[in-house]
């Protein structure tokens, strides 16, 4: 079979394996690279190469993550796999590896286990939008009724956490057999069917440039004779000269107009996602704007003080706290470019939170911040990072 030409023109989609320890996430990851390399080109990564994942630091947190890539007929996939449960928790909460969709691996022999549940809950909390299931080790279950029972359990569990359990594709197979090149239904064809399910079920992610304009403000300058310039890196969307924009967060929302965009001291007619720019604001005084606010397309984002979040608390070894914290804890929450103090309410029945834990909390900030669900933040004490979190629900 001739290999199709490897091109970079295919849309790029980020996925990752999640699920209970020893259910076959890393074996499946290796099988995906092998089966797809054979069909569409790309590089096969063996189990040992993936399992020895290098440690990375994201927001001051050490996370071991393996990154692999493979092609399908329609797409280029970037895929993350983590060696340990704690790495998954950290990865999902910090957004170090943003996922457009997740592959939930469940052993058909064991059915859903505690980490299966925990990873589904985390996926819901941090806003992983789509899940596709690979029911692994199907060769270890002789009774087809038992296999159906496990499938039902998985669907129920997904529905419980607000995923569309009845509609989610579930592919049955054996990652190990696929990795060994087995051509039977549960071998290579099962992995090919999984990739087809990713292609069909996970929609192409919206590119940052197509989303509503947003730029976190890093600095504010006054330029005599020209007015006020704010600088920062455009997070999403496009800003054109002459467009009306809002300044959101910390103070009451204010409207202004962009009268100029500059980059590297050159004037442009627009700035777009990824650009480091200065934006000239009409009629805005230097003292009306500050770091920590955002420039945004009018009506696209609102300021909030009260929200629910999922946080990971750094362990002592990671440079975090040495002691637990309790209800009413008041650290700083670092959003984009600035710290805001907030008070923490723990869930009912949770007395305290230990370093190394992850927990759902409620936060009330002393000043409003422009936010939407999925926004990442750091938890800090006097400039030192002690945790990482993600906004899971806005309360007010």
Curated annotation (Swiss-Prot):
Subcellular location: Cytoplasm
Domain of life: Bacteria
Purpose: GTP hydrolase that promotes the GTP-dependent binding of aminoacyl-tRNA to the A-site of ribosomes during protein biosynthesis.
Subunit-structure text: Monomer.
Amino acids binding GTP: 19-26, 81-85, 136-139
UniProt entry keywords in alphabetical sequence: Cytoplasm, Elongation factor, GTP-binding, Hydrolase, Magnesium, Metal-binding, Nucleotide-binding, Protein biosynthesis
PANTHER family, alphabetized: ELONGATION FACTOR TU, MITOCHONDRIAL (PTHR43721:SF22), ELONGATION FACTOR TU-RELATED (PTHR43721)
Region listing for G3, in residue ranges: 81-84
UniProt-annotated binding residues for Mg(2+): 26
Pfam families with a match to the protein in the record: GTP_EFTU, GTP_EFTU_D2, GTP_EFTU_D3
Root EC class: hydrolase
Protein name: Elongation factor Tu
Region annotation G4: where it falls in the sequence: 136-139
GO molecular function: GTP binding; GTPase activity; guanosine tetraphosphate binding; translation elongation factor activity
SUPFAM superfamilies, A to Z: EF-Tu/eEF-1alpha/eIF2-gamma C-terminal domain (SSF50465), P-loop containing nucleoside triphosphate hydrolases (SSF52540), Translation proteins (SSF50447)
Cellular component GO terms held in the UniProt record: cytosol
Covalent S-S links between cysteines: none
């Amino acid at each position: 079979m001739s290999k199709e030409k490897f091109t970079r023109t295919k849309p790029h989609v980020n996925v990752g394996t999640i699920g209970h320890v020893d259910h076959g996430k890393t074996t499946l990851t290796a099988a995906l690279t092998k089966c797809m390399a054979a069909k569409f080109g790309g590089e096969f990564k063996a189990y040992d190469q993936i399992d020895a994942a290098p440690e990375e630091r994201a927001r001051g947190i050490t996370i071991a993550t393996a990154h692999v890539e493979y092609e399908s007929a329609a797409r280029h996939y970037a895929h993350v796999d983590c060696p340990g449960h704690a790495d998954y928790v950290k990865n999902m909460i910090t957004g170090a590896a943003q996922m457009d969709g997740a592959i939930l691996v469940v052993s058909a022999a064991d059915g859903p286990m505690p980490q299966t549940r925990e990873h589904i809950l985390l996926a819901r909390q941090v806003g992983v939008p789509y899940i596709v299931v690979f029911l692994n080790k199907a060769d270890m279950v002789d009774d087809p009724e038992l296999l159906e029972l496990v499938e039902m359990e998985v669907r129920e569990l997904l529905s419980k956490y607000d995923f569309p359990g009845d509609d989610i594709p579930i592919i049955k197979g054996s990652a190990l057999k696929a990795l060994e090149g087995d051509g039977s239904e549960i071998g290579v064809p099962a992995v090919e069917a999984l990739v087809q399910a990713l292609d069909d079920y996970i929609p192409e992610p919206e590119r940052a440039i197509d989303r509503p304009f947003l730029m976190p403000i890093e600095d504010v300058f006054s330029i005599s004779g020209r007015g006020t310039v704010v600088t920062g890196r455009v997070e999403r969307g496009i800003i054109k000269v002459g467009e009306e924009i809002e300044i959101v967060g910390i103070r009451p929302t204010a409207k202004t107009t962009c009268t100029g965009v500059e980059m590297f001291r050159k004037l442009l007619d627009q700035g777009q996602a990824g650009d480091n720019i200065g934006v000239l604001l009409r009629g805005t005084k230097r003292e009306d704007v500050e770091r920590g606010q955002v420039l945004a397309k009018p009506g696209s984002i609102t300021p909030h003080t009260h929200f629910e979040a999922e946080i990971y608390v750094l362990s002592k070894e990671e440079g975090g706290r040495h002691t637990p914290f309790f209800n009413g804890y008041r650290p700083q929450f670092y959003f984009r470019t600035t710290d805001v103090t907030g008070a923490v309410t723990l869930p009912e029945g949770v007395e305290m939170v230990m370093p190394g834990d992850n927990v759902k909390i409620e936060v009330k900030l002393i000043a409003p911040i422009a936010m939407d669900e999925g926004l990442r933040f750091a938890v800090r004490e006097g400039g030192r990072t002690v945790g990482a979190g993600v906004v899971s629900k806005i309360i007010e």
